[in-house]
Amino acid sequence: MKKIALLSLLFTAVSFAQIQKMEPPFWWSDMNLSNVQIMFYGKNIAQNEVTVSNGIVIKDIQKTENPNYVFVTIDTKNTPAQDFVFTFKNGKKLFTKKYSLKARRANSKFRKSYDSSDMIYLIMSDRFANGNPNNDSDASVTEKADRTNPNGRHGGDITGIINNLDYIQSLGATAVWPTPLCEDNDERGSYHTYGQSDVYKIDPRFGTNEEYLKLSAELHKRGMKNILDYVTNHWGWQHWMYKDLPTYDWVHQFPGYSQSNYRMTTQFDSNASAIDTKNCVDGWFVKSMPDLNQSNPLVLNYLTQNAIWWIEYADLDGFRVDTYSYNDKEGISKWTKAITDEYPNFNIVGEVWMHNQAQMAYWQKDSKVGAIESFNSHLPSVMDFTLYDALGSVFNEDKGEWDKGMIKIYDNFTNDFLYPNINNMLVFAENHDTNRFNQMYKNDFKKYQ
């Protein structure tokens, strides 16, 4: 009996040694996205033949130039919630890995999202409230807490947000948008977490995946909504996958470092040169943020499944998507459509930081401006940066001048006809990338009013 137990433990240890990552870690039955592409990562794992139990159908197996990856697509349509087993065999050697299809929450597909009736409270996650000082520095990540460093980690976390939800609600907020919470293992400046190193894992300095579930539950208990800040354009250079790329073109590569020219207008400018468009879309946002290649089907599928996984897992109510207009526009359109096909009422707002209404309208779903180039982003909402531009100066200007003062606000509204859905715009006076509104007006309370 002891010998059998020992062999069982040894077999399990071998299995874990062979598979270092399995993503998504589980899925759900009764999903619109029923052909699930599971990525297995481990030393020379592609040398194995892959089979699966329970009559589950393998639709496709993709191996890349990197033998440490294999992508296995299974058909889960009409498959009830259950556990099944993948078997990996190489000659006489074999090991197994359990996979789970879970039952969905009731009415998950038609979940209610945020809309123009909501007041959203934006939180810089590391800088809001420290609810658990014990997780300020974690052995698994490089940068430790240092409140003396303005660019360092200061200790804000998920527990701190939960502890202050009653306060946030008392301000009139009906939704919370924390800046990204997934792991960012950059050695410095990681507090913003826009350079993520593991997109299936909450940064341990913020808490755990389970604590993020609790945040959603506590928000919903109060009738409030949880908006996840998602990044499709780039990861951080410490992402575990960047250190061992599945394919050379998983990220955009250049002979040397090439930074984005930030000219988002090249995405639709009929006069733009091909090199300018390429530099905008394929160039890296900054040197520490490898630019993801959404025109690679494996990358696009990985990002799509990851986004849907977080919605279903954490019971989310919406997305804000960072640097939306820097992505490959056809790829990001497919990504957005896949999510809204899965969740028809799910709102997604894109950061389209442009200063012209026609250019911004191009990126909203069913835009007549986009239709000129036969493009539909499928993006329900965009952030109203032109209104933000006007709000930042109008109260400092002479109202008697023809094009100054409140006339700027009026002129902004006269262009509302360009948007296919003006009632689904995210209106704001400031955010984490801008000066505070009081800074713009030198703490003049009358102007603030």
Question: How does the language model describe each region?
Answer:
Residues 137-140, 186-202, 232-276, 358-374:
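Aromatic- and acidic-residue-enriched segments that line the glycan-binding/catalytic groove
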Residues 18-46, 103:
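Beta-strand/beta-sandwich contexts
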Residues 63-113:
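Extended acidic/polar, glycine-enriched regions
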Residues 216, 220, 234, 306-308, ...:
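Active-site-proximal helices and loops of the catalytic beta/alpha 8
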Residues 4-13:
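Sec-dependent N-terminal signal peptides
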Residues 144-159, 195-209, 285-300, 317-326, ...:
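The substrate-binding groove and active-site-proximal loops of carbohydrate-active enzymes
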Residues 111, 119, 165, 240-289, ...:
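Core domains of carbohydrate- and sulfate-ester-processing enzymes
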Residues 91-224:
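N-terminal structural segment of carbohydrate-active enzymes
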